[in-house]
Amino acid sequence: CDRRFSRSDELTRHIRIHTGQKPFQCRICMRNFSRSDHLTTHIRTHTGEKPFACDICGRKFARSDERKRHTKIHLRQKDKKVEKAAPASTASPIPAYSSSVTTSYPSSITTTYPSPVRTAYSSPAPSSYPSPVHTTFPSPSIATTYPSGTATFQTQVATSFSSPGVANNFSSQVTSALSDINSAFSPRTIEIC
């Protein structure tokens, strides 16, 4: 590749790139490395050794470049503190967007909003229907008979549901005579109900 080196060990290390030679082997996992310092760093993953400590917070690292990258975090934090502490030298008509002051306004007002979901349906018959906020809808058993011109509408409703705003457990049997609403509905409408 026509590269030149002043030291023979640098040339030897470089030639390994071209030949793919990896003479340094980890005795724990048998992984091979072209450089001895890479093997030394790798062995730290097995031993858990972390010889490079941060001078500011004391956190330890296995590699010096990891410590160097970590130290930059502290420098950025320090720069931010200096920016926040330094007063503005020129007055600007536009306020700064970043501020070290946090303002909160406590309120004793509790705001509630009506639910957009209706909890009951109006019914032409004096009976009760399940709420639309049910998580399950049981199938009602409906039996309609017409002995001598009178109608009987029987429904068994056993519903249990939980909702953040509503907590009801109820079981009821609704039996109502439809003879009082026969004038309002045709026999076909009563069959559908």
UniProtKB/Swiss-Prot annotation:
Residues 65-109 are annotated as: Disordered. GO terms for cellular component: cytoplasm; nucleoplasm; nucleus. It is found in: Nucleus; Cytoplasm. PROSITE patterns: ZINC_FINGER_C2H2_1 (PS00028), ZINC_FINGER_C2H2_2 (PS50157). GO terms for molecular function: DNA binding; DNA-binding transcription factor activity; DNA-binding transcription factor activity, RNA polymerase II-specific; double-stranded methylated DNA binding; hemi-methylated DNA-binding; histone acetyltransferase binding; promoter-specific chromatin binding; RNA polymerase II cis-regulatory region sequence-specific DNA binding. Its main location: nucleus. Residues 69-79 have a biased composition (Basic residues). Residues 85-109 have a biased composition (Low complexity). SUPFAM superfamilies: beta-beta-alpha zinc fingers. It comes from the Eukaryota. Keywords: Activator, Biological rhythms, Cytoplasm, DNA-binding, Metal-binding, Nucleus, Repeat, Transcription, Transcription regulation, Zinc, Zinc-finger. The keyword Cytoplasm applies. Pfam families: DUF3432, zf-C2H2. The record marks 3, 7, 13, 31, 35, 59, 63, 69 as: Interaction with DNA. GO terms for biological process: cellular response to interleukin-8; circadian regulation of gene expression; interleukin-1-mediated signaling pathway; positive regulation of DNA-templated transcription; positive regulation of transcription by RNA polymerase II; regulation of protein sumoylation; response to auditory stimulus; transcription by RNA polymerase II. A zinc finger (C2H2-type) spans 1-18, 24-46, 52-74. Transcriptional regulator. Recognizes and binds to the DNA sequence 5'-GCG(T/G)GGGCG-3'(EGR-site) in the promoter region of target genes. Binds double-stranded target DNA, irrespective of the cytosine methylation status. Regulates the transcription of numerous target genes, and thereby plays an important role in regulating the response to growth factors, DNA damage, and ischemia. Plays a role in the regulation of cell survival, proliferation and cell death. Mediates responses to ischemia and hypoxia; regulates the expression of proteins that are involved in inflammatory processes. Binds to DNA motifs with the sequence 5'-GCG(T/G)GGGCG-3' via its C2H2-type zinc fingers. The first, most N-terminal zinc finger binds to the 3'-GCG motif, the middle zinc finger interacts with the central TGG motif, and the C-terminal zinc finger binds to the 5'-GCG motif. Binds double-stranded target DNA, irrespective of the cytosine methylation status. Has reduced affinity for target DNA where the cytosines have been oxidized to 5-hydroxymethylcytosine. Does not bind target DNA where the cytosines have been oxidized to 5-formylcytosine or 5-carboxylcytosine. Belongs to the EGR C2H2-type zinc-finger protein family. This is Early growth response protein 1. It comes from Taeniopygia guttata.
